[in-house]
């Protein structure tokens, strides 16, 4: 399935039905009073999150949603039926903006979260409402109100606990494929991962968390080089960053500092997140890892996803951080990974 993380959508709520001009007509009541019914309300437009959706792809094929108008009122004081509402399904993590103003209307992060996005117009009143002692046969009624309409900009930020960050070929896709059921494309050339991948890591019977693998970052990503910048927003919601560096990197320290620099250029808040360093591909070397990053106390883990080396320790460490971060109130800024 193609991954799409932004879309524009036009939504229009239904207009209200027109009020009716009618007079009571019965066999023995030749001059009955007004009995025009009210028009029905136009259908609302709602947005609702669905945890089974992971992309905004559907909006590339359908980007206009128009609710039904209310039915017009009828005689005998019959109110028209309300218009059928429209419920638009979006993935969890969708940010909704008014395209005209840029205002954030909603940030939908919970499953089955439902918000009213465009309100249907009120039905017009029938002529029964306009009779007075001096004007007993009104021949006018109200039109229905117009339904609200907007163009919305939708932006998806994936909901994950762990964000995997690193240069191309650092082993991110291999790791997520081993510890979860995700099956990203894996090959020995740069930028094999072209879109983010999500995987659910389950272990020890009851522990589980969501891991996101994004395309590799290269130096200059913040200026648009490579693919990583396009998808960095998908790790903004994560609770912990795992920075992956291959053990055969020419300069692990320099690579680490480059990654931190690109993250900071994109958003300084990314460096406030807890982080760990994961040295990958330990199966290609017989040398024990002896590494201390200058000026850092960030935990370092050495793993081989292929051989299964160090994975239990890595998952345990990530789980401890996730549990601690889940306990942090949402209005409290998390501490950095120092």
Swiss-Prot record:
Residues annotated for Mg(2+) binding in this entry: 173, 193
Gene3D superfamilies: GTP1/OBG domain, P-loop containing nucleotide triphosphate hydrolases
OBG-type G domain segment(s): 160-323
Main location: cytoplasm
Any single GO BP term: ribosome biogenesis
Hydrolase recorded as keyword: yes
Cofactor(s) this protein requires: Mg(2+)
Domain of life, per lineage: Bacteria
InterPro entries for the chain: G_OBG (IPR031167), GTP-bd (IPR006073), GTP-bd_Obg/CgtA (IPR014100), GTP1-OBG_CS (IPR006074), GTP1_OBG_dom (IPR006169), GTP1_OBG_dom_sf (IPR036726), OBG_GTPase (IPR045086), P-loop_NTPase (IPR027417)
Amino acids binding GTP: 166-173, 191-195, 213-216, 280-283, 304-306
Protein name: GTPase Obg
Species this protein is from: Chlorobium chlorochromatii (strain CaD3)
Gene, per the UniProt record: obg
